[in-house]
Amino acid sequence: MTAPATRKDLMIVNMGPHHPSMHGVLRLILTLDGEDVIDCEPILGYLHRGMEKIAENRTIIQYLPYVTRWDYLATMFTEAITVNGPERLSNIQVPKRASYIRVIMLELSRIASHLLWLGPFMADIGAQTPFFYIFRERELIYDLFEAATGMRMMHNFFRIGGVAADLPHGWIDKCLDFCNYFLTGVAEYQKLITQNPIFLERVEGIGTIRAEEALNWGLSGPMLRASGIEWDLRKIDQYECYDEFAWEVQWQKEGDSLARYLVRIGEMEESIKMIQQALEGIPGGPYENLEIRRFDRVKHPQWNDFEYRFIAKKTSPIFELSKQELYVRVEAPKGELGIFLIGDQSVFPWRWKIRPPGLINLQILPQVVKRMKLADIMTILGSIDIIMGEVDR
């Protein structure tokens, strides 16, 4: 009886675009030698919606509901970058109270994004239990968002020169209660996860990115800080009022999946510190720049005219974007989210180029997964933290 011949050919496997570990419609064409990854080719574009072209045919206020569909788990940051560009282009001042409200909302959104990264990341590597604990805290953040903005997701809260509405009565106390409670939740995560030997086996030394590689590939956010580069735009650019708070940049030296996990866990604790300081020191005053608003004035309005019902309402500010170009950026949960904006004396942007952190960070994936095991792809891809709505735009 002859023994069956062992095949030694390379095997090509398609992972995605409907794989639960892809976190969206990402497709990977993998070349395998047994369990070893020889090559990886990402296929993008399944969620492309032409967001940059849409911006060229909308005013900024008309475009705001669209931007929440880029990174739909951290929508406050896409709104912030959309209003920050025209504000700097037209030199519009933001009241101090509005700036504090923005920082509170941004940091709450950062925590919610990191929580929704941590839960599925743990599920990808085989730990299902933390997933449910993490959703418990995330629901509390969404309840705060709903009370302040009216929406749990896709908030449409930021406006040029401020925010859409002031914080409701009692919201600050509720948020302070959440901050005190959440710190115990983070301690629970660390007790449950960080020293778990099975978790450490799956992440320690997996997907290592050296500092030089991180800089050469243009990585940003936790991906860059986990590789030993202490770079955070909240410290570098000092936009909004981040320079008024005491907090530390979280970073690690190892550059592996464990380091990226530790950076994000540390960032959640630092965000709570900033929120507490902002809530305790929030000033009074207007929540928007009233000079931006334009009211329709009619000398003798008739109650039965078609336009009558619109007179008392605040219309959207429409102004020309001056003929110049500008790059503006914020530190989003996934990295540097930037907009390159060109105005041409029109109410519409002439060019609206989006720099999504997820796309830039994803580019290093083929290099990192080579010579790794097939099962490590889920760990590495999960530690990068991508949202395909932002990657494909």
Swiss-Prot record:
InterPro entries noted in UniProt: NADH_Q_OxRdtase_suD (IPR001135), NADH_UbQ_OxRdtase_49kDa_CS (IPR014029), NDH1_su_D/H (IPR022885), NiFe-Hase_large (IPR029014)
One protein family per Pfam: Complex1_49kDa
Entry keyword NADP: yes
Subcellular location: Plastid, Chloroplast thylakoid membrane
Keywords assigned: Chloroplast, Membrane, NAD, NADP, Plastid, Plastoquinone, Quinone, Thylakoid, Translocase, Transport
Cellular component, GO annotation: chloroplast thylakoid membrane
Membrane topology according to the record: Peripheral membrane protein
PROSITE patterns: COMPLEX1_49K (PS00535)
Keyword Transcription regulation among record annotations: no
GO BP, one annotated term: photosynthesis, light reaction
EC number: 7.1.1.-
Reactions catalysed, as given in the entry: a plastoquinone + NADH + (n+1) H(+)(in) = a plastoquinol + NAD(+) + n H(+)(out); a plastoquinone + NADPH + (n+1) H(+)(in) = a plastoquinol + NADP(+) + n H(+)(out)
GO MF: NAD binding; oxidoreductase activity, acting on NAD(P)H, quinone or similar compound as acceptor; quinone binding
PANTHER family assigned: NADH DEHYDROGENASE [UBIQUINONE] IRON-SULFUR PROTEIN 2, MITOCHONDRIAL, NADH-UBIQUINONE OXIDOREDUCTASE 49 KDA SUBUNIT
Function: NDH shuttles electrons from NAD(P)H:plastoquinone, via FMN and iron-sulfur (Fe-S) centers, to quinones in the photosynthetic chain and possibly in a chloroplast respiratory chain. The immediate electron acceptor for the enzyme in this species is believed to be plastoquinone. Couples the redox reaction to proton translocation, and thus conserves the redox energy in a proton gradient.
Subunit: NDH is composed of at least 16 different subunits, 5 of which are encoded in the nucleus.
Family, similarity comment: Belongs to the complex I 49 kDa subunit family.
Listed name of the protein: NAD(P)H-quinone oxidoreductase subunit H, chloroplastic
Lineage of origin: Eukaryota, Viridiplantae, Streptophyta, Embryophyta, Tracheophyta
Gene that encodes the chain: ndhH
